[in-house]
Curated annotation (Swiss-Prot):
Lumenal side of membrane: 1, 127-177
Protein name: Golgi to ER traffic protein 1
Lineage: Eukaryota, Fungi, Dikarya, Ascomycota, Saccharomycotina
Principal location listed in the UniProt entry: endoplasmic reticulum
Signal peptide residue numbers: none
Length: 223
């Protein structure tokens, strides 16, 4: 395996691991960034205080300790407002951090992988024994990538303008084989098909909600 293929495989594996672990991202972010933030600490403190006051209200009688019960209710109303405001701030803070992490992923993974594919997209992963092993159109796409199909209409238009005959030339390519771009496309297609079959075999079927029967009238007709 060449270093070009090895780097491409590393990019694919890292991106797939991030995709498969999406459900755990919130837990990781919470433990790393959100749990010890000042807003989160204050939010948890207020929630515990509200829970304590609610338990205290349940343990006392509203008739025997009306003043205490009323004072606690006022505290609860104030705490509810503060908790709502802090919850909105915490949500905005979380979304801001997630946005920064998406930018980091874009700069460290997505953009470098795209640049790498543009740079080494025509790198031959598998060599073909000879030029005529497959149809010229297929061989051209495999060795030059999907851009080869986009260039064909331009070559056809050029041949019409110049009056020369149009032919798909593949013998002039320095190397004939499967390029890195096509190989990555095939690899991702195989992975997607495996994911689809796995989901079909092991995913739990979604049951339809049962219909509720309601009695809309109590009339009884007698023939």
């Amino acid at each position: 395996m060449s270093w070009v293929v090895a780097i491409a495989v590393v990019f694919v594996v890292v991106l797939k691991v991030l995709e498969y672990s999406t459900s755990y991202h919130d837990l990781v972010l919470q433990s790393l960034f959100f749990k010890n933030s000042p807003i989160s600490v204050k939010f948890e403190t207020l929630v515990k205080e509200r829970r304590s006051i609610q338990e205290e209200n349940k343990s006392i009688s509203a008739q025997d300790n009306y003043a205490k019960w009323t004072k606690n209710n006022r505290k609860l109303d104030k705490l509810d407002k503060e908790i709502t405001e802090l919850g909105a701030q915490l949500k905005a803070h979380n979304e801001q951090i997630k946005g920064h992490l998406k930018k980091v992923k874009l700069l460290l993974l997505t953009v470098p992988f795209l640049c790498f594919k543009l740079w080494k997209g025509k790198h031959i992963v598998y060599n073909l024994p000879h030029h005529q092993m497959f149809p010229q159109l297929v061989a051209g796409v495999w060795s030059q990538g999907w851009l080869y199909l986009a260039i064909l209409p331009l070559q056809l238009a050029k041949s019409i303008v110049t009056g020369s005959s149009f032919a798909i030339e593949t013998a002039s390519f320095p190397h004939m084989g499967v390029s890195l771009g096509i190989w990555l496309w095939a690899l991702n297609s195989v992975i997607s098909n495996i994911e689809f079959m796995t989901m079909q075999l092991w995913a739990k079927p979604v049951s339809k909600p049962s219909k509720k029967l309601e009695i809309v009238t109590d009339e009884i007709k007698v023939d």
